[in-house]
Structures are given as C-alpha cells and as structure tokens.
Swiss-Prot record:
Tetramer of two alpha and two beta subunits. It is an enzyme of class 6 (ligase). One of its GO terms (molecular function) is ATP binding. Its cofactor is Mg(2+). The lineage of its organism: Eukaryota, Viridiplantae, Streptophyta, Embryophyta, Tracheophyta. It catalyses: tRNA(Phe) + L-phenylalanine + ATP = L-phenylalanyl-tRNA(Phe) + AMP + diphosphate + H(+). It comes from Arabidopsis thaliana (Mouse-ear cress). Belongs to the class-II aminoacyl-tRNA synthetase family. Phe-tRNA synthetase alpha subunit type 2 subfamily. This is Phenylalanine--tRNA ligase alpha subunit, cytoplasmic.
C-alpha cells in the first residue's frame, strides 16, 4: 500500500515535501513508509533528502496528567464548591505527589485559599495543562512560553524526528519493475531478458563480529602497563631467529650445556649460521669460557666458533637483554630499566601445561652498586602490583646469574606456595666482557605469560589458550583483565 501511494502520488505531483505529513494524510504508519522509501531509493526510483525536526513527547508524568488531569485541577475538584475542607482531609483524598504539586500550582493560579482550611476562590477552572499535553500527543505545535512551562515541570522532553522529502529518481516508474537480486543459475541463463538490481556500494553491511582481543593480549597489556608505571622502557624483540652466540655464549652458558642440545632447541637449516658478530667481543667471551677471567676460572674447555655461529629460534628473551646490555656498554654508562614480553621457542614435549612456543616476561635494571636487597625490593614492588603481596625466595642455579632465586607466591585459592618466576644478578663473566664498568650490576627476573593468564581465566589446559585449537568463542567472550583486583 505504501509503495503504491508513493509512486502514484509522484506520477501527478512533483514531490512529497514531508513524509510525516504524507503518512498522516494517507493513514500509513510512518515507520512502514520509511522502509518503503529506503527500498525505492535503493532501486533509484526516487531521490530523497533527510528532514530533521525537533518535536516534543510526553514524559511518563506528562502521560499520566494527560489521562487524569493536572495536579492543580485534581486538587481544585477535591475542594467542595461551598465551604471548606481541612488540609489533612484534603491530603487523604489525593496522592502525595499530586497534593504537593497541586497545592503549589493551584495557589499560584489563585484558585484556592490555602490555610488550615482550604476553600475555592473561583467557581470553575480550565485544565489548560491537560489540553496542551493532549495536543502535543497529536503532534500539534505550541508557543515557546507554553513549551518552556511544560518543559520546566518535566512533563515533556525534546525528540529529534527524522523523515524525508521525496521526488522522482532516474529510474522512476508508476509501478516497480521486478528485478533479479540473486545470481542463480536460472537467472544467469536468462540474463538478456532480466534486469538485475544494481549494487549499492554505500549501503552498510552487517556488523562484522571481529576485533576481539585474545586473553594473552589483555594480560600482556596489563603487565606492560605495570612496567611502564615503574619507569621501564621496552626492548625491541622482533628477532625470533637468533645466533647461539647471543642466545647462549654471551650469557656465559657453556657449549656442552644440555639446553643447547637439539632435543631442547630448534636449530635452523637455512640459514644455518650467522654472518656477523662483534669480533673483539667474541674473543673476550671465548677467553672467559676457556680460561676464565674477571675473578672466574671459566669452564676449561675448547670453545668452538662454529657452535656460536649456529642460528636457532631463541629459547629465551634474555638473548635480547644480552644485545641491549652490549649496546649499552659501547657508550658512556647511563642507568637503564628494560623490559620485554614476547615469544620464545623450546623443543619440548607438548602436554596440557607445556608448548613448544610460549611467551616470556622479562625485566632488568642496570645501575651502579645494585645488591640482592635491591632485587628483592623491586620484586616485591612488581608482584604487589599484580596482587601478589606474599612472596618467598629460594636459592637456585642459572648459568648467567649468581646469586639466583626462584620466586614463590602464596596462592590463596590453592592454599599453598606456588612458583611464579625466576630471578638473579647477572654474573661478572657476562657483564665485564661486554665492556660495562666494574661497579655496574644488573638485576633481572622473568616469568611466563601463559601461567598467570591461565590462573586469571580459569584455564587448565594451555592448548585451550594458545595455538590452532583455541575456541574462538573463548576469545569473543573472555572478560576484561584486571590484574591485582
């Protein structure tokens, strides 16, 4: 009906000036009319222009007064025509809100005499408020003074009305032609006889359910924010492929260490070796491995350059730390705080708690005269920001840190102490060959990203969190991460 009305009207008229007036004139629901207008516009039967008007609609209170009358009139009618009524008796006849507003407005209008007794001052009154509200419901316009009065009493609120003006489009016809909208086999076979609907490249498509952040990314952002709040700067960690030299040798890890075995490390076939290393630094590292130095006896073995040249997928982000500390040593010393959160790779058996690739969080501070007490203080500050205030430290061994400590936190839910990370002070055998001053110390700590994420989101199988088997619904539904709250 709406389509025939629009096309028929335009056949004899230049345009429809206002879709609202048109819908009222032809007794068509405006929402239905708008849908038909959009459809005809899509096929270019008509051209349209938007119309926006500020209209007024009744509030819930306004609707009530439009039906029952204004409070002042309700109060006036409750007062007897002759004589008077006590204020208490009058209050019993009316709702509390009606009585309160009615007293104010009726007194203001000088309709009643207010005291202990209430009596009428006029014989009859006209309920202008109710009349105005009813006319606003019908879409009629009012003078500014009346609108402001009703608005002040919170009986009406503004609303933007949207409609259209309509005129003939380039494809106008008194009757819509049937056009093919789907590229079916039958339609393609009869394409010469058919007219196809044009593509509307301006039309908005269905919202794409995308852009959800993975749980690991949310937790990673929280850790990054904590590091930044503590004054750390992020290290560049984009080189997944690293040489054995920076990954192992520069960290004073011997070449016969089990971690360097192919069973624990992914070595590259192409390119199998690195091209360039800082030769003077390589010589110092070789010397400290073979015969010691800087107060160390070394490992007393034949250090091989070909082992150091082998390329691999980095097994820890400490390889990045070694590069950054070496670069720092080549300039006049400046204290630094570094952190990184990125992927590392281990040639390990995959099970519900281990993957061949995972994420490592690492923080380090390089400054003069640092002690083990400084490390413990920083760790307590760092982990307290994660909501872990109960910490314990246990001596441990790492090839490149001495002393070394495992970090434990008391898990309230499990009711026991849980290992949450590793820490230590980088050895002089690692730092001094780089060229750092003798009084410079480096304290560092690290932990995985996956373990706290699994705890926060209640995941007990790491393969449900990371990898090709992750359920997309988990990514879409996982809540905002708030560490420490």
């Amino acid at each position: 009906m709406a389509e025939e009305a629009i096309l028929g009207f335009l056949q004899n008229n230049e345009q429809i000036t206002d879709s609202g007036q048109f819908s009222a004139e032809f007794n068509i629901d405006h929402n239905e009319l708008v849908n038909v207008i959009k459809s005809l516009h899509g096929f270019r039967y008509i051209d349209v222009q938007d119309i926006k008007k500020e209209t007024w609609i009744l509030t819930d209170e306004g609707k009530k007064y439009a039906a029952e009358g204004s409070p002042e009139v309700q109060l006036f009618l409750a007062v007897p025509e002759e004589g008077s009524i006590s204020k208490d008796e009058l209050q019993k006849k009316l709702a509390p809100a009606v009585f309160k507003i009615g007293c104010s407005q009726a007194g203001k209008n000088k309709w009643v005499e207010m005291g202990k007794q209430v009596s009428r001052k006029v014989k009859d009154v006209e309920d202008k408020v109710k009349g105005q509200l009813l006319q606003i419901q019908q879409g009629k316009e009012f003078d500014k003074e009346s609108i402001n009065s009703l608005k002040a009493r919170k009986l009406i609120v503004p609303q933007i009305w949207k409609g259209y003006s309509v005129k003939k489009g380039p494809n106008y016809a008194p009757e819509r032609k049937k056009v093919a909208t789907d590229l079916t086999r039958e339609n393609l076979q009869n394409w010469k006889e058919l007219e196809f609907k044009e593509y509307n490249f301006k039309a908005k498509g269905a919202p794409v359910d995308a852009g959800h952040l993975h749980a690991l990314l949310k937790v990673r952002k929280q850790f990054k924010d904590i590091f930044v709040q503590m004054g750390f700067e992020e290290m560049p960690t984009n080189n997944y492929v690293e040489s054995s030299f920076w990954n192992f040798d520069a960290l004073f890890q011997p070449q016969q260490h089990p971690a360097r075995d192919s069973h624990d490390t992914f070595f590259l076939k192409v390119p199998s070796t690195t091209r360039t290393l800082p030769e003077d630094y390589v010589e110092r590292v070789k010397r400290v491995h073979e015969s010691g130095g800087y107060g160390s006896r070394g490992y007393n073995y034949d250090w091989k350059r070909e082992e150091a040249n082998k390329n691999l997928l980095r097994t820890h982000t400490t390889a990045v730390s070694s590069r950054m500390l070496y670069a720092l040593a080549q300039k006049p010393f400046v204290p630094k705080k570094y952190f990184s959160i990125d992927r590392v790779f281990r040639n390990e058996a995959v099970d519900r708690t281990h993957l061949a690739e995972f994420h490592q969080i690492e923080g380090l501070i390089c400054d003069r005269g640092l002690t083990l007490g400084d490390l413990i203080g920083v760790l307590e500050d760092f982990f307290s920001r994660l909501g872990m205030s109960k910490l314990r430290f246990k001596p441990a061994y790492n090839p490149y840190t001495e002393p070394s400590m495992e970090i434990f936190s008391y898990h309230e839910g499990l009711g026991k102490w849980v290992e949450i990370g590793n820490s230590g002070m980088f050895r002089p055998e690692m730092l001094l060959p780089m060229g750092l001053p003798e009084d410079v110390r480096v304290i560092a700590w690290g932990l995985s990203l996956e373990r706290p994420t699994m705890i926060l989101y209640g995941i007990d199988n790491i393969r449900d969190l990371f990898g090709h088997k992750v359920d997309l619904d988990l990514i879409k539904r996982n809540p905002i991460c708030r560490i420490g709250i």
